[in-house]
């Protein structure tokens, strides 16, 4: 959206909806590792994965939609999750579903990551079309953007930079005291 406001070269971003459901912790031992399906043309396929909290997360679907705010779940989407997950994991306990949700991924029509300075908008760095394995690629994408900015702005390393910080406290693991 922002790219198209500043550049004459237009990107065509398609909202790709992914629906999920989350099972109660009582279902958490149904699988011990992430179970991946074979990926399709729209994404990585439906997976079943234990969460750090002991639940099971199942999804996503992948459907290109028009509505850029369309984060509703649908009966057909949730049924598709169950059917596809059931091909790899038997007897998923649907009675233990505690919530369902959907999110949108920004699919770019060119089917590739776009990480570059917009040619006709100096200083505007695009990071678009980042899909699977986008999460895994995030550190490399960050380094690419840093390199673009370093070269453009002639940045120098700060020898006094402190790259470590204290860890984030998890209140659930703390004692009452």
Model-based region annotation:
Residues 1-42, 67-68, 72-79:
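Predominantly flavin-linked oxidoreductase catalytic cores and closely associated redox partners
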Residues 39, 43-45, 49-53, 64-177:
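C-terminal catalytic lobe of FAD-dependent flavoproteins
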Residues 61:
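Residues forming anionic-ligand binding surfaces in small-molecule and nucleic-acid pockets
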């Amino acid at each position: 959206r922002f790219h198209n406001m500043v550049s004459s070269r237009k990107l065509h971003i398609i909202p790709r909806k992914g629906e999920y459901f989350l099972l109660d912790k009582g279902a958490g031992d149904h699988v011990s590792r992430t179970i991946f399906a074979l990926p399709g043309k729209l994404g990585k396929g439906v997976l079943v994965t234990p969460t750090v909290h002991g639940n099971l997360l199942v999804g996503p679907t992948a459907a290109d939609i028009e509505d850029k705010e369309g984060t509703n779940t649908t009966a057909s989407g949730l049924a598709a999750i169950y059917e596809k997950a059931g091909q790899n994991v038997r007897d998923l306990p649907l009675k233990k579903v505690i919530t369902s949700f959907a999110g949108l991924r920004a699919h770019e029509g060119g089917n590739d990551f776009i990480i570059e300075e917009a040619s006709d908008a100096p200083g505007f760095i695009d990071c678009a079309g980042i899909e699977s394995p986008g999460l895994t690629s995030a550190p490399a994408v960050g380094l690419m953007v840093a390199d673009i900015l370093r070269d453009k702005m002639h940045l120098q390393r700060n020898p006094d930079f402190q790259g470590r910080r204290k860890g984030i406290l998890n209140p659930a693991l703390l004692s009452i005291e």
